[in-house]
């Protein structure tokens, strides 16, 4: 019991150290230098640094390889850059998302040289910004073999539950046209914003699918997230644009999802209107049949649920590597002014 308490105390301390190192996206060098220095003390690891990404691998001693991955960056500060520490919790930006998970990865890499399967630890940059900047893509472009594994587990905050797969995400813009006129003579024009009434009703009434896949219930969603339009207080607007977010369950692909949304919205469109996909990231299958993941769930009696958001498990799924989310911290606290991680969760 004494050794267990010491180990937990060290993990908590390491998490606090990591939280104290600012690492907003594109500014991760300091925290990556810290991690690299720690890893250099483990002679059983082969370490590769590519930009602000680090991959540490054990040798090939078994027939299976497990990859543990985590991003080192955080979102910009929003009132949570003042770090607080109590006996039970650490408050601060990145504490839940995901420096508790990074601390666990780093501790395992440094303290467990003899593992049941071969290990790959991936500390990567720029997850919290547009996907094109993601450090995993930088690693793949330079040395893709470093990301080969039989299973990938990302240490995103899941409150210690397995969150299987992930839902895909798509963003659309819908631009509707009108005709400009003076508001004193609206019959001489056509109000583009008024044309939104039918579109908004259709989206509000949209019945989302809730498929159960490998025992996990996913919940698709369709939401308007932005409305743009208007010229001046006395002008009938001749254009308006909606931004729409669609979450896609992993039992179908993005092409099928796009066709459905186009079928939903095209009845409200006319010549000159435009519906565009401006961003898309695919879903990932649950992967619960993977023997390493199955053994882990059964041995530790872990709860399993669907991942409703999008994470980089989709990157690995696209590479043919089953992947899941599993880490300390409450995801609902991520990116908030009250972001924190509890000792018990770590």
Question: Where are the regions a protein language model picked out?
Answer:
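Acidic-glycine-rich active-site phosphate/pyrophosphate-binding loop
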Residues: 73-86, 149, 164-175
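Short glycine/serine- and small hydrophobic-enriched flexible loop segments
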Residues: 17, 107-114, 198-205
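Hydrophobic/aromatic beta-strand patches that form the interior of the parallel beta-sheet core
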Residues: 66-68, 122, 153, 324
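Glycine/serine-rich anion-binding loops at beta->alpha junctions
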Residues: 89-104, 182
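Acidic/His- and Gly-rich active-site-bordering loop/insert found
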Residues: 2-95, 330
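Acidic/histidine-rich catalytic neighborhood of metal-dependent amide-processing enzymes
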Residues: 103-171
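Metal-dependent amide/peptide-bond hydrolase catalytic core
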Residues: 3-6, 23, 157, 164-165, ...
